[in-house]
Amino acid sequence: MALSGGDDQVPPGGPMTVSTRLIDAGSTIMQRRLPVKQMNTHVSTFAIYGGDMSRLIGTHHYVHRVNDEFLQCAVYASDRSDAPLIGIEYVISDRLYETLSEDEQKLWHSHAYEVKSGSWAYPRLPEVVAAPELKNIAKTYGKFWCTWQIDRGDKLPMGAPELMMSPQGVGQGVLRPELVKRRDEKYNISTDDLKHTRAEIAEPEWINPMADYWKQHGKCFVLDIATVEMNRHAQFP
């Protein structure tokens, strides 16, 4: 069973030189970083590897709200300034989810349990402030690709991305108490209290059975890397 908060992962490489520090300092002053500046919200939650559900990790989503029905998140292993970037997650409304093909829907997970169980938390943000957003998130679906498996000790991003699943209240989707306790102590919160506070949040009337595919069908999706012939002919519009 793998439990990871990602606080001790440092990739190999030499220290920054004076010249690289100057480049960074100059870029900070002279360049515009508009996409990054749109990441306004920090979410602490958990995820499970779709191909190996014994591996549960803590994640830190930094959220860019593109509009009221589409969020895009940079996912880090911790909230430190040197935290490894371990993946990306896209979050869409239930309305947008229903426009997807069934094959595409299978790659997404629901968020209702994450919200209701208290595992989806906004560190340092009062629950009363987060409440309206939680009601919306409970009805959304997410697609999370992990690109760096630091919980298995990878010092660099290795192999193909892994499709991640959302914790659920059954089977191998149950949250591990050790990891929840570590998160709660770090942010001085109580997941159990959050669960109690959110009891009045309405669950979706219907969660599409194509989502949380492992839970509904006992199967998962993994990527493999294969060598193929290059397409040497340009495609005309």
UniProtKB/Swiss-Prot annotation:
This is Oil body-associated protein 2C. The gene is OBAP2C. It comes from the Eukaryota. Belongs to the OBAP family. InterPro entries: OBAP-like. PANTHER family: OIL BODY-ASSOCIATED PROTEIN 2C (PTHR31360:SF11), PTHR31360.
